[in-house]
Amino acid sequence: MNPLIKWPGGKRREYKYIDSLIPACTRYIEPFFGGGAIFFHLRPSCALINDISQDLIYFYTLIKSDNKDFKKAISDYEHHWTSLSGYINFLYDKIQKTYMEYRINTFSKNILTAAVNDILNSGTDLFNKLFDEKFTLSNGELLKEIRENLVDKLGRMKELEIKSQSYLSEKDLRDNIETGFRSGFYMHFRNIYNDIILNRNHSKKLAGEEKSANFYFIREYCYGSMFRYNSKGEFNIPYGGIAYNKKNFKRKIDNLFSPDVIELFRNTEIYNLDFLEFLTMIKPGKEDFIFLDPPYDSDFSDYESRSFSRSDQERLAEFLYTASAKFILIIKDTPFISDLYSGKKAIRMLNFDKQYTYNVRGRNDRDVNHLIITNILNRDG
């Protein structure tokens, strides 16, 4: 079973390094859950999971309860994302013709903007038919983002053609134009996401389930599952690009509420606490197994702008020094982390290399050494 949500730092690829160590257990415990790759791979019969992210834990809680309002809200995203195809198809020939004139310098960028605006306005009746303003919250704002992103994409297409000294193929033209439309759709709902996290404007119009559906949509379609915020506290990762245009969003949603997922969460307790509060409360014992994937030793702030400092690393280490439960910790190898765990009785450290596809706010170097820190000698303990 794969993770349900795109989340940075997932450990699905690391499973091969720890498979031989994971013991049979009464309870599976994970204090830094995130996307939960190991949990979903193992599918434990009894689990306790925790994460400090309120948005993430609320998302899992809604799935666990098979919440109908959340299911409807997230299905609305899929419906409107699919409906966007009809709008694109209706206007594509006009947009393509306009771009063909723009690429040979028939008119300026300002005239391009006006021409695109006229084309979009010609599809107003279809637009208002396809997009329910109760869902979009503002069709005018959605159309504005589509216009701006489409004009920007057409401009970058021309720059690319000039740089490569060749024209894009018909397929590439269509893919790029579609990306302009879909990027505008994404940006509109990213704006709403920022209203939610900063408690502005549209946030007050949405129920909790609708906010969580927005959160899931943004996680699914932002570039590389990354998190990044500007100085105003606004999430600013762009749309994922051409490769995201044809993602099967309905299949993703169907999987969220599949019988296997519902059954797995039926046997799972979900918490939203500081990791040490969580571990102290549940009292892991010798029949339990703890998998830990904490933030790394770096200048890292978590995905809701909370820091995980060296004092937090020390709090974690102090707990693990005397843990009676079996545990596996995966973390970036730094002198500080090595010093924390070196020479401790019954704790051993194993090395492996990891290459990251994306870099998330200083968390991930492209090529780094990682440590497996554990009190397990082999699968039998």
Model regions and ranges:
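Long, positively charged, glycine-interspersed low-complexity recognition regions
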Residues: 291, 297-381
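S-adenosyl-L-methionine
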Residues: 1-27, 32, 37-38, 42
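Class I S-adenosyl-L-methionine-dependent methyltransferase module
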Residues: 46-265
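Conserved acidic residues
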Residues: 274
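Hydrophobic "anchor" residues on beta-strands that sit immediately upstream
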Residues: 26, 47, 289
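Mobile active-site "lid"/loop adjacent to the S-adenosyl-L-methionine
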Residues: 229-231, 235-248, 295-315
